[in-house]
Amino acid sequence: MPDSALPPCSILILAGGRGQRMGGRDKGLIEWQGLPLIAHLQRLVRPLTDDLIVSCNRNQERYAAYADRLVSDDSLDFPGPLAGIRAGLAVARHPWLLVLPCDAPRIDHALLETLLQAAGRAPARPWMLRCGGQWEPLFSLIPTHLAEEIEHAWRQGDRSPRHVLLPLGAQAIELAAGDPRLANLNTPELLAKHHELK
């Protein structure tokens, strides 16, 4: 069950990418430390929500085991993470949507709690992690009432989550450059490098 001290949120794990850096493999299903990457994220966030959404564009039957609901992009050409965010916002059951990428298994509960607690400080605005001055829009907390504004930006041709969220008054959770919790294990080399790390 979700922690009652934190705002009720839906959680979206983005696993709908092309996996180009992995030779076209489905990143969320690649194993790391004996489990698919998606399983590490699911195990971490499951206690925080009763509305866990996975955005995926293939292997839906395998992803179903890790989600309450699956969403897919409305285009077959892998249009990018903003498409998955739109799909998640469209079905989210809670006032907030916490967005995470499937290839970041080193993120921890403390960082997610920090992000969720920030919601009370600016309840009408999105929050993003900012690592060494670099915005990280795929680690974000978005009020679901902004869905229509995000949809409008999409219709205007914007495909960048950062470009869409910043004009909506996005606030930052600041992290030091190189924070290992945000490591994206999106190449075979990075998977190998982080394999022994806990």
Swiss-Prot record:
State the oligomer form and interacting partners.
Answer: Monomer.
Which family does the record claim for this protein? Belongs to the MobA family.
Q: What is this protein called?
A: Molybdenum cofactor guanylyltransferase
Catalytic activity, reaction form: Mo-molybdopterin + GTP + H(+) = Mo-molybdopterin guanine dinucleotide + diphosphate
Entry GO terms, CC: cytoplasm
PANTHER family found in the cross-reference section: MOLYBDENUM COFACTOR GUANYLYLTRANSFERASE
Q: Which UniProt keywords apply?
A: Cytoplasm, GTP-binding, Magnesium, Metal-binding, Molybdenum cofactor biosynthesis, Nucleotide-binding, Transferase
- Which amino acids does the record list as binding Mg(2+)? 103
Cellular location of this protein?
Cytoplasm
Q: What is known of its domains?
A: The N-terminal domain determines nucleotide recognition and specific binding, while the C-terminal domain determines the specific binding to the target protein.
Question: Lineage, please?
Answer: Bacteria, Pseudomonadati, Pseudomonadota, Gammaproteobacteria, Pseudomonadales
Species of the source = Pseudomonas paraeruginosa (strain DSM 24068 / PA7)
Q: Which NCBIfam families match?
A: molyb_mobA
Q: Name one Pfam family in it.
A: NTP_transf_3
What EC number(s) is this enzyme filed under?
2.7.7.77
Q: Which HAMAP family match?
A: MobA (MF_00316)
Reported cofactor(s): Mg(2+)
Annotated GO molecular function terms are: GTP binding; metal ion binding; molybdenum cofactor guanylyltransferase activity
Q: Which InterPro entries match?
A: MobA-like_NTP_Trfase, Molybde_CF_guanTrfase, Nucleotide-diphossugar_trans
Which Gene3D superfamilies does the entry mention?
A: Spore Coat Polysaccharide Biosynthesis Protein SpsA, Chain A
Note the superkingdom of the native organism: Bacteria
Q: What does the protein in this record do?
A: Transfers a GMP moiety from GTP to Mo-molybdopterin (Mo-MPT) cofactor (Moco or molybdenum cofactor) to form Mo-molybdopterin guanine dinucleotide (Mo-MGD) cofactor.
Q: List the disulfide bonds.
A: none
